[in-house]
Amino acid sequence: MTNAASEIGTTTSTVSRQIARLRETLGIYPFVKADGDWHLNPALRDLVTAFEQADGMLESELSRLQSYQPTAKRDVKIGAPPTVLSHMLSQGIREFVKNSPGIRPVLESRILESGLGTTDISVVFHPPESGRVRVKRCGVLDFALFAPKGWRNGDGWVSLGERVAGPYNQARRHFFNSDPTVLVDSFPQAIRVMRDIGVAGALPVIVAAQEPDLELIGPAGLDVTRDLYVIHHETRSTDPDIRATVNWVSTQLTDAKRKTRELREMQNRLCDSPA
């Protein structure tokens, strides 16, 4: 419920009351617990699909009507991990706004979500396994280990929490021979800690490239590459504003992928060069 409340910008008690009312209306529990987590009741999948389809068709029709008002701006909500927003999409936002005067991009940070939630378009690590969602793989987010100049193994390391970094931290514990010295909830926080107390940490390559005082420390076996998928609902595919925004997001991710590869090659050369 905490995650759901955060997703829609309300409190857990409000979510709890809404679920209770929904149960009364439907006559069944809307969610069931399986494998230690809550999932949509399978009996409601067709109902949810019908709502999503109706919502998508309504939004597309509203967009068509707005085309008769050339000065009106339409919000298109784009969800993505914070690094994608700050280091990939933000790079081309000025040109997009200039070329698409009828669209106002609304950027929303989303980390582990796999669906659209309340967004029109999302960039996700894992696309939904079901539902009428269009999926396009068109980018990557590369991670590697970095440290301030002069760092030596044994000086410690910083990590994001287990919810985000957990799948990768066992190998990092083995490399550093210790648990993380500090846990943080964002990469900007990690960079501040790295500078303040001289510890190492895993960072997105595209982020670390803008921090000249941080050096790649390897090893390559601990590098991580995450695919990025652009998703939107199938019923929005004919919506010109959605199409334009999806094309822009896809182009930004593709360009960032190329730049990241170039940065990675340059960092590897610097790391391998004699001191």
Model segments located where?
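Residues within helix-turn-helix
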Residues: 2-6, 13
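Alpha-helical residues within the helix-turn-helix
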Residues: 6-7, 24
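Residues within the DNA-recognition helix of helix-turn-helix
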Residues: 11, 18, 92
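Conserved amphipathic alpha-helical core elements
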Residues: 22-23, 214
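A short LG(V/I)-centered, amphipathic sequence patch enriched
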Residues: 23-42
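Alpha-helical linker/hinge and terminal dimerization helices associated
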Residues: 25-26, 44-69, 256-259
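Central regulatory/effector-binding core of bacterial HTH transcription factors
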Residues: 73-128
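C-terminal regulatory
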Residues: 116, 128-198, 202-227, 256-275
